[in-house]
Amino acid sequence: YDLLHPEVNWRELQREFITQTCRGNDYSTYSRPNRRYMSAGRYFPSGVSESVDELIIAIDTSGSIGQQELTKFLSEIQGAVEVTSPSSIRVLYWDTEVCRDEVYGEQGQPVDQLVHSTKPAGGGGTWVGCVNKYIQEKQIQAQATIVFTDGYLGGDWGTWSNPLLWCILDNKSAKPTTGTAIHINL
């Protein structure tokens, strides 16, 4: 794909949404003393950082989404991948069902290969509820979901079990009833 420059300032969005909902836990513990001070006979706690778990990126591939829209979505995803550091990213392509599930990171391909190795699937109607249904059925434990769509969902924004960010393409009238929404232009 010939990617475009991402419109969304993902660094800013990361501060607002992703780090609030997806941040790992940083804490200190004496169970692993800081070795720098042990030679001086002092015991201080060492810092422990837990990484962000799985992030789901759900991409609308219904009939209203063409190659131009997919390229824009992938450009924005590349921007998000460059500034986040989840342990894994799960990409779900959906129309009325989840048509493809790709895992990048710990269990799959390297995250930095996502945009170049992904294979979009779908092209039917639109039912966003299939994404959360799939997440529940597969018992996917993600810290957040980012949904890329044109927002033509027939008024059904679904119910979600984890923090949600909508990236809505060229549809300022789309007003999700759940989660946080940002509008992007083609």
At which residue positions do the language-model features occur?
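VWA/integrin I-like adhesion module and closely mimicked acidic/polar interface patches used
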Residues: Y152-L186
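Short, solvent-exposed polar/charged micro-motifs at secondary-structure junctions
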Residues: Y37-A40, R100-V103, D156, P176
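Von Willebrand factor
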Residues: E50-G108, C130-T149, L153, W166-L169
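A conditional alpha-helix N-cap/helix-loop micro-motif detector
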Residues: E7, L70, G124-V128
